[in-house]
Design a protein with these regions (language model features):
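Preference for long, amphipathic alpha-helical scaffolds in soluble/luminal domains
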Residues: 1-287
Length: 287
C-alpha cells in the first residue's frame, strides 16, 4: 500500500487499520469532487470520465459513510446538491451510465448503449437515495426525493426473480441505513436475503475463474442470516482469500478491460489498493 496505492486508498487503509486521520481521507476524496458537487476524475478506476457521474458519486458516498461524515460537512452538502440536480425525472432515478462514459478509457461493462439502464436498474440509485435520506433533514427536498426513489426501488425489488450481486449490495446498503425508518423492513430484508442466496456462487472450485459473487460478497457480518446458513462456505471463502494473496501481499482483480490492456494496467494498479482494503475488512470481521 505504501509503495503503490493511490493517496486516497493509503489514507483509507491508515484510517481503518492503523489509527489514521479521517480528515486525510476526506482531503484526498475531495480532490475527486467537481464544482457541481458530484464526483468523477477516475475515482472509480474502471472509467476515467472527468465529469461527475452517479457511480463515482456512489463510490464517494460509501467512503464518506466509512469515516462517519455528517450532513453538515461541506463535501457532503455539495454532494447532496449534486444528487438533487442530476436526478433524471423521466427515468425517475440517477442514470448509471451516460454517453459521455464512452469518450474516455473505460472497462467494457461501463460502455453506454441505448437502453443500457434496463441492465443496471437501481444500481446505484437505491443506495444513493438512502444516502440522500441519511444526510438530509426530514421534510427537506432531498429527503422527499430520497423516499420517492426508495418507494419505486422497493416495488421493483419485490417483483424481481433474480438480481446481479452488485445491485443486491446496493439494496443491502440501503436497508442497513434505513431499516429503522422503513415501514415493512422484515419483508424487504427477506426479499434481499432470497435474492442474495440465489446470486451467491456456492461452488468453491469455481471462485476466481469467472466474475461472480462469492459468499463474502453478499454476507457482510456474523449477524447476517445467511452467515448462519452458509457458515462453512464463509470459512472456505476466508481460506480462499488467504490462498489468493500474491507474493506482494495483495490481490489482483478478477476482471480486465478486454482489448484495452494498456489502460487496464493503470486501472489494475489502482484496483489492487481498493481490493486490499475490501478484503482486509472482510478478514477482520470474520476471523
Amino acid at each position: 500500500m505504501q509503495r503503490n496505492a493511490r493517496p486516497l486508498e493509503l489514507a483509507r487503509w491508515e484510517y481503518l487499520f492503523d489509527g489514521g486521520s479521517r480528515e486525510r481521507v476526506i482531503q484526498y476524496l475531495a480532490s475527486y469532487q467537481n464544482e457541481d458537487g458530484g464526483f468523477g476524475n477516475g475515482l472509480e478506476p474502471d472509467f476515467w470520465l472527468p465529469d461527475s457521474s452517479a457511480i463515482a458519486t456512489w463510490s464517494a458516498c460509501q467512503q464518506l459513510i466509512e469515516v462517519n461524515a455528517t450532513k453538515d460537512e461541506k463535501i457532503v452538502r455539495n454532494l447532496v446538491n449534486y444528487l438533487l440536480l442530476s436526478y433524471n425525472r423521466e427515468a425517475e432515478l440517477w442514470l448509471t451510465v451516460t454517453p459521455e462514459h464512452n469518450l474516455y478509457p473505460h472497462a467494457p461493462h461501463w460502455q453506454y448503449t441505448k437502453d443500457v439502464q434496463s441492465k443496471w436498474m437501481y444500481n446505484p440509485s437505491v443506495e444513493l437515495a438512502a444516502y440522500l435520506i441519511h444526510w438530509s433533514n426530514e421534510e427537506s427536498e432531498a429527503n422527499k426525493l430520497g423516499w420517492q426513489v426508495i418507494e419505486k426501488a422497493l416495488t421493483y425489488l419485490q417483483q424481481a426473480e433474480d438480481m446481479g450481486f452488485h445491485e443486491i449490495n446496493n439494496y443491502q446498503k440501503a436497508a442497513n441505513l434505513l431499516q429503522d425508518k422503513m415501514g415493512d423492513s422484515k419483508k424487504v430484508l427477506a426479499k434481499i436475503h432470497q435474492l442474495a442466496e440465489r446470486a451467491m456462487n456456492k461452488l468453491p472450485d469455481t471462485w476466481g475463474k469467472s466474475y461472480g459473487a462469492t459468499p463474502l460478497d453478499l454476507i457482510h457480518n456474523k449477524e447476517d442470516l445467511l452467515y448462519h446458513q452458509y457458515r462453512n462456505l464463509v470459512e472456505e471463502n476466508i481460506v480462499y482469500l488467504h490462498k489468493t494473496i500474491t507474493t506482494e501481499g495483495v490481490w489482483n482483480p478478477s476482471w480486465d478491460w478486454g482489448d484495452d490492456q494498456l489502460n487496464f494496467a493503470v486501472a489494475k494498479q489502482q484496483w489492487i489498493g481498493i481490493i486490499a482494503i475490501n478484503n482486509q475488512q472482510k478478514l477482520q470481521i470474520f476471523q
